[in-house]
């Protein structure tokens, strides 16, 4: 909750950007705007750095986004996305990114060692303590290293080069995982609320019930700032976000069942229908959330957007297995087990805060090939599965032109192009 005030400041910047785009009726890519909001938050969480990329370009953000555009966009066909220059471009951009993040690491190490030396010499400012301020991931990593290597607290040279490299790589992972998936969730939620006005109506009513009727984004932000836990009262909005993540899970996890340490020698996968077990020692297991989320035993009418399915007292599917012991692992956009996403609570919180402030202010309409997407049907064209037809371009998946594509994580096709309208003018 200590990050809530910072999230609110960034949220209001996002809201104002949306207002400007609504007033100009500009065609823009929502996912790119949401990305800058999300990466500003994770920059603060990871390194206690203010990127402020919603206001002006930041070198780390620009280099990071460049890195993502250089990643392959297919994971199966090796020649489908062939680019002979890519390895060299990635090498150069990686060096640049490592240098930029390395400077942030060095800045923090310098500050810590200077403070520790001043305290040792009796010249420290007691009012400024690393223990008193917000703890970033970088802070926590340095704390752990200093505990194992006490000399590093006062001597910068005591930090090993190997530790620094690992720390830079870890920070890159946190920044990547902490922004790309959240921005896609925000974009898809705003897209789906336009397609389902009955769901939007209930979200708006819930926001009114918690923060007051006809509150502005600034008033809602003030309410959350004074009572941060009030955001947890938005149970229906939370269900909306969960349903969005069910339909459009941004990532999944590959589990390597290595034989090297013998830990996987008794690992089996069991066919639930036949009960037959198969050894998978030495294989990689890939639990694909997108497929699991369409299992009708847990999620009836799986391609439909029905947030109520996550509210046990209101679910239209009381016979589904979702709320049984067997269903506890059915919803898995952040994966499960020891390799699950450690930032899932942060991701859900920043999504709730932003959406609570923005959805009553503006309405987003996706627009593909000059066509506004105002309605949805599960299968819209004969080419629903067009990638199986040579030379045919896929137009929709499950009726969505904003289907997911591989761009770092799973992001909306075309970065979700569309236009905004002020709800006060609708």
Task: Label each residue range with its predicted role.
Residues 224-243, 254-286, 301, 306:
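Cytochrome P450 C-terminal beta-domain/meander region
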Residues 203, 244, 282, 305, ...:
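Hydrophobic, well-ordered secondary-structure elements that form the walls
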Residues 60-65, 121, 195-251, 281, ...:
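Cytochrome P450 I-helix active-site segment
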Residues 411-426:
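C-terminal helix/juxtamembrane-tail motif
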Residues 181-194, 354:
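Short, small-residue alpha-helix embedded
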């Amino acid at each position: 909750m200590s990050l809530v005030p910072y999230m609110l400041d960034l949220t209001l910047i996002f809201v104002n950007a949306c207002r400007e785009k609504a007033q100009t009726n500009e065609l823009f890519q929502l996912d790119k705007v949401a990305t800058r909001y999300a990466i500003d938050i994770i920059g603060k969480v990871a390194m206690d750095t203010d990127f402020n990329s919603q206001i002006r370009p930041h070198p780390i953000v620009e280099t990071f986004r460049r890195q993502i555009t250089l990643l392959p966009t297919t994971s199966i066909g090796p020649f489908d996305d062939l680019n002979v220059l890519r390895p060299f471009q990635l090498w150069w951009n990686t060096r640049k990114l490592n240098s930029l993040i390395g400077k942030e690491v060095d800045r923090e190490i310098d500050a810590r060692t200077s403070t520790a030396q001043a305290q040792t010499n009796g010249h420290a400012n007691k009012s400024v303590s690393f223990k008193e301020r917000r703890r970033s991931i970088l802070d926590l990593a340095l704390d752990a290293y200093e505990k194992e290597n006490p000399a590093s607290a006062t001597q910068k040279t005591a930090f090993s080069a190997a530790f620094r490299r690992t720390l830079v790589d870890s920070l890159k992972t946190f920044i990547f995982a902490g922004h790309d998936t959240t921005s896609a969730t925000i974009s898809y939620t705003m897209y789906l609320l336009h397609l389902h006005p009955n769901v939007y109506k209930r979200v708006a009513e819930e926001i009114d019930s918690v923060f007051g009727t006809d509150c502005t984004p600034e008033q809602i932000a003030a309410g959350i700032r004074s009572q941060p836990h009030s955001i947890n009262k938005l149970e229906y909005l939370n269900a909306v976000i969960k349903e969005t993540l069910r339909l459009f899970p941004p990532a999944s996890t590959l589990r390597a069942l290595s034989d090297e340490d013998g830990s996987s020698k008794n690992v089996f996968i069991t066919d639930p229908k036949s009960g037959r077990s198969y050894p998978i020692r030495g294989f990689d297991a890939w639990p694909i959330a997108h497929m699991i989320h369409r299992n009708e035993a847990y999620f009836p009418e799986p391609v439909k957007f029905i947030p109520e399915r996550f509210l046990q007292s209101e679910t239209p599917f009381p016979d589904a297995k979702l709320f049984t012991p067997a269903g506890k692992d059915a919803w898995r956009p952040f994966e499960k087990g020891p390799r699950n996403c450690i930032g899932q609570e942060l991701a859900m919180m920043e999504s709730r805060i932003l959406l609570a402030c923005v959805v009553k202010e503006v309405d987003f309409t996706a627009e593909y090939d000059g066509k506004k997407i105002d309605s949805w049907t599960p299968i819209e064209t004969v080419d629903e599965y067009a990638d199986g037809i040579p030379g045919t371009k896929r137009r929709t998946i499950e009726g969505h032109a904003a289907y997911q594509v591989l761009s770092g994580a799973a992001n909306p096709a075309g970065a979700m192009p569309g236009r905004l309208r002020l709800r006060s003018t609708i």
